[in-house]
Design a protein with these regions (language model features):
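Generic beta-sheet signal
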Residues: 3, 131-139
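Short beta-strand scaffold positions
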Residues: 52-53, 115, 136-137
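Active-site signature of alpha/beta-hydrolase-fold catalytic machinery across serine-
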Residues: 64, 144-148
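Phosphate-handling substructures
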Residues: 65-119
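GST superfamily/GST-like fold recognition
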Residues: 139-143, 171
């Protein structure tokens, strides 16, 4: 079983360097183009199910990638980390260590995001008819999911670009995910 966990395309808040987790902003023209380019990655992959975060930036990305030809489900479990009262503020306010910082401001900890993502992706892949699944999520959520299975530093060092795809193999017996590749599409 294979899970393709993908980050959404570039958004207005990405360009403006605004913190966005629970809040949302639209895809930019470049973000729309990125999703179109990323769709080619899936040309020879027979996806059987698709999911996205409830954020519009993620569902819009998924619709572009699948040419609006595939039904999908929006899941709260795939949402980005909640940054509390820092939502919509400048990224310059981000602390060096984000692991628990936002909890005191009504947000989530990194461990909470990791547990939510692991639970959600495991529930998705445990379904019998789910062999090749696309799930569109967010940079922070993708990093915290990866952190459950390996040290993410090497992957993060090379960037979590918009529309990058994390290809995971799901082991049904062990209920674990193994990262096979990260496709950044040259972005």
């Amino acid at each position: 079983k294979t899970l393709y966990l993908m980050r959404h395309g570039q958004t207005l808040f990405n360009v403006r360097r605004k913190i966005q987790g629970a809040c949302d902003s639209p895809l930019t023209e470049l973000g729309i183009q990125q999703a179109g380019i990323a769709s080619a990655y899936f040309d020879d992959i027979d996806l059987d199910h698709a999911y996205s975060s409830t954020a519009e930036r993620a569902s819009d990305t998924l619709e572009i990638v699948t040419n609006e030809l595939m039904p999908y489900k929006r899941l709260k479990g795939l949402k980005e980390m909640h940054f509390g009262t820092f939502e919509g503020e400048s990224e310059d306010l981000n602390p060096k260590d984000k692991s628990t910082f936002f909890v005191q401001y009504g947000g989530e900890s990194g461990d909470q995001v990791m547990e939510r993502m692991v639970r959600t992706c495991t529930e998705i892949m445990e379904q019998d008819d789910h062999q090749n699944v696309l799930a569109v999520s967010h940079a922070g959520a993708c990093i915290h999911f990866l952190r459950a299975w390996q040290d993410p530093r090497e992957v993060v060092k090379n960037g979590i670009t918009n529309c990058c795809v994390f290809k995971y193999e799901y082991d049904v017996e062990a209920k674990t995910f193994a990262l096979l590749e990260v496709e950044r599409h040259g972005f």
